[in-house]
Amino acid sequence: MFLLNSLSRITRGNRSKRHQNLSDASSSSGSFSKKSSTSQLVRTGSPSVEPTALYLQQPFVRTHLVKGNFSTIVSLPRFVDLDEWVALNVYELFTYLNHFYDVFATFCTVKTCPVMSAAANFDYTWLDNNRKPVHLPAPQYIEYVLAWIENRLHDQNVFPTKAGLPFPSNFLVIVKAIYKQMFRIFAHMYYAHYAEILHLSLEAHWNSFFAHFIAFGKEFQLLDKRDTAPLKDLIVVLENQGNI
């Protein structure tokens, strides 16, 4: 909660415009049908030696708002239903990510990010209604993802909030799809906008948030290694530092 509250002053000025965009995106024809809500990872070009990413350099990589290992706070408490615990945490993590993107939306534009990239040779494509992969500017891709997730979170058939409504039998499968898309936003922000994160002095918040996100994903096996490839080096560092 402290993490979310500490962002409130920064996001207040940006939220109105971005949530209008989110509303427009979620109501666009066919954009968020079950058929078109997936996307693909595309490796572009040939492997090459890249300079060390800014987010992997000292002192930034060891800068955290929260000290200690997040595994202690993500594990399932006794007597708590697994689906309830996962639903609560995914909802909160999505809320935090939404607030962070309110800040970053100013920097993530069609001009600065014409494709949704996560590394020099990693681009994400969106699958349209005909299952055809299409390249989208990063802000459009992210708006689509956020709106799609928000629709899922407010679907009583997927995330029930009323007494007596059960979780669907494929609930964890749905959550994995949501988690994968959330990871892609993290990957793009680390790759394309870490300089802006530093400029806003948000690296401690962002690094701790990512460590929390990864720790929860590992605890409940919500991410595959293939999905986390763009940030695998950072995840190894976080493991070695005892953050996750």
From Swiss-Prot:
<dbReference type="GO" id="GO:0032153">
    <property type="term" value="C:cell division site"/>
</dbReference>
<comment type="function">
    <text>Required for coordinating polarized cell growth during interphase with the onset of mitosis.</text>
</comment>
<keyword id="KW-0963">Cytoplasm</keyword>
<dbReference type="GO" id="GO:0051286">
    <property type="term" value="C:cell tip"/>
</dbReference>
<dbReference type="GO" id="GO:0051301">
    <property type="term" value="P:cell division"/>
</dbReference>
<dbReference type="GO" id="GO:0062200">
    <property type="term" value="P:RAM/MOR signaling"/>
</dbReference>
<feature type="modified residue" description="Phosphoserine">
    <location>
        <position position="48"/>
    </location>
</feature>
<dbReference type="GO" id="GO:0005737">
    <property type="term" value="C:cytoplasm"/>
</dbReference>
<comment type="similarity">
    <text>Belongs to the MOB1/phocein family.</text>
</comment>
<dbReference type="GO" id="GO:0007165">
    <property type="term" value="P:signal transduction"/>
</dbReference>
<dbReference type="InterPro" id="IPR036703">
    <property type="entry name" value="MOB_kinase_act_sf"/>
</dbReference>
<keyword id="KW-0131">Cell cycle</keyword>
<keyword id="KW-0132">Cell division</keyword>
<feature type="compositionally biased region" description="Low complexity">
    <location>
        <begin position="23"/>
        <end position="39"/>
    </location>
</feature>
<feature type="modified residue" description="Phosphoserine">
    <location>
        <position position="46"/>
    </location>
</feature>
<dbReference type="Pfam" id="PF03637">
    <property type="entry name" value="Mob1_phocein"/>
</dbReference>
<protein>
    <recommendedName>
        <fullName>Maintenance of ploidy protein mob2</fullName>
    </recommendedName>
</protein>
<dbReference type="InterPro" id="IPR005301">
    <property type="entry name" value="MOB_kinase_act_fam"/>
</dbReference>
<comment type="subunit">
    <text>Interacts with orb6.</text>
</comment>
<dbReference type="GO" id="GO:0005634">
    <property type="term" value="C:nucleus"/>
</dbReference>
<dbReference type="GO" id="GO:2000100">
    <property type="term" value="P:regulation of establishment or maintenance of bipolar cell polarity regulating cell shape"/>
</dbReference>
<feature type="region of interest" description="Disordered">
    <location>
        <begin position="14"/>
        <end position="45"/>
    </location>
</feature>
<dbReference type="GO" id="GO:0005938">
    <property type="term" value="C:cell cortex"/>
</dbReference>
<keyword id="KW-0597">Phosphoprotein</keyword>
<keyword id="KW-0498">Mitosis</keyword>
<dbReference type="GO" id="GO:0030295">
    <property type="term" value="F:protein kinase activator activity"/>
</dbReference>
